[in-house]
Amino acid sequence: MKNIFFVGIIALTTLALVGCSTSTRQTDEKCHITGTANNNLNGKKIFLVPMDRPATMETVDSVVIENGTFEFTSDVNEIKVIRVDYHFRSGVQDLLVVSEPGDLEVVIDSISSAKGTPQNDSLQRWKELTERFNKVCVPFRITGKNAEKAGNVAVAEEMKSKLDSLRNNYRRQSHYLGESMKEGALHDFLLKQFPKTYKKKMPDGSIEEVPFFK
């Protein structure tokens, strides 16, 4: 009976400690990144680099990948890039993340991904949108270039028109994704990359504000 009671106490204590640890992580206002990577990268360095600040010893974090896993902790809420040592970067996709408070799970591979916090879930959606856009554009670009080389103006113009339409769609969706977020690092990033209007230099040298998408 005493043994059963003792085991019960240990179990309750363990649950309490796990609960306290989770609660602390949720309230420490830091971004906890847990990552997995291809086992071929074991023993290689992986870096967490700020996107909009100089990469220095103070701003860049690095760890060694062990057993296909790695971890980072950041207390600066900003857009960062996770990338492996450039000697081993071939075939491995860099990954944009937002180092906002919370627990973030990332996968670094030929197609990298992230999930776990609101901005990073939205960033993953934008990444997938971007990848679909790039993929669907490829055949139109190839056909357009071949048509230009062959002197087929009509087909070249048709492909250009299709690409313009796809690009306009992509820009509009990216802008409104950023706008829907109201605030935060990803909101700022998307609206900077995909504004409603931008200043364009005209043939006569004047500067006009024109739509970035329709």
For the regions a language model picked out, list residue spans one by one.
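C-terminal motif of bacterial Sec signal peptides marking the signal peptidase cleavage site
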Residues: A16-G19
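Flexible helix-coil transition and linker loops at the boundaries of alpha-helical arrays
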Residues: H175-M181
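Alpha-helical repeat scaffolds
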Residues: D204-K214
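Positively charged n-region of N-terminal signal peptides that target proteins for export
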Residues: M1-F5
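Alpha-helical linker/edge segments of TPR/alpha-solenoid repeat scaffolds
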Residues: T197-D204
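Amphipathic alpha-helical repeat scaffolds of TPR domains
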Residues: K182-T197
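A non-transmembrane, solvent-exposed segment enriched in polar/low-complexity residues
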Residues: S21-H175
